[in-house]
Amino acid sequence: MLNCKQEVETRVEWIKNLLKTTGAKGIVYGNSGGKDCTLVGILSKMATDNVTGIIMPCESSRNFGIDREHAILVGEKYDIPQIEIDLTPVKQAFRNVLSDSIGDCAMAYANINPRLRMTTLYAYAYKNNLLVAGTGNRSEAMMGYFTKWGDGAYDFNVISDLTVREIYEILRYL
């Protein structure tokens, strides 16, 4: 059983120190509406007022439905501004450009979405002098469930050592 109060305080202080030492003005994170993004958003907001979540749907009907609704609810509940950027046209452009050399090989396109999201987050972060927060948990890292140079790319990850069970435990506490 975690000491959730201590875990939250320690992680929030770590983020504050990171912002101070890097000189960044705030934090941006990809908000899919899931548990990991929710916890990252809340902890980031507890550390600084300058936090932005970016909702980045890309082709999937789920991205435009329940996931999007959850992402918006989290932003509203915790006063975290959300920006929505539909990456579908960008992915379609990639397919058009690459179709002659790759064809319609699904696996070749499988990791484009997380890499487009990473590029979007870093472009926004650069423009606004922000750090990109990672949203992957320890369970995902242990299983290799992330995309190299996609959702595995970030400036810091405040939940990388937490299991799914621990994330739910902290979310219930908050």
Describe the role of every protein-language-model region.
Residues 56-60, 156-163:
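Short, acidic/turn-prone active-site loops that include or flank metal/cofactor-
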Residues 161-174:
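Short, flexible loop segments at boundaries between secondary-structure elements
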Residues 145-161:
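A mobile, often basic/glycine-rich helix-loop segment
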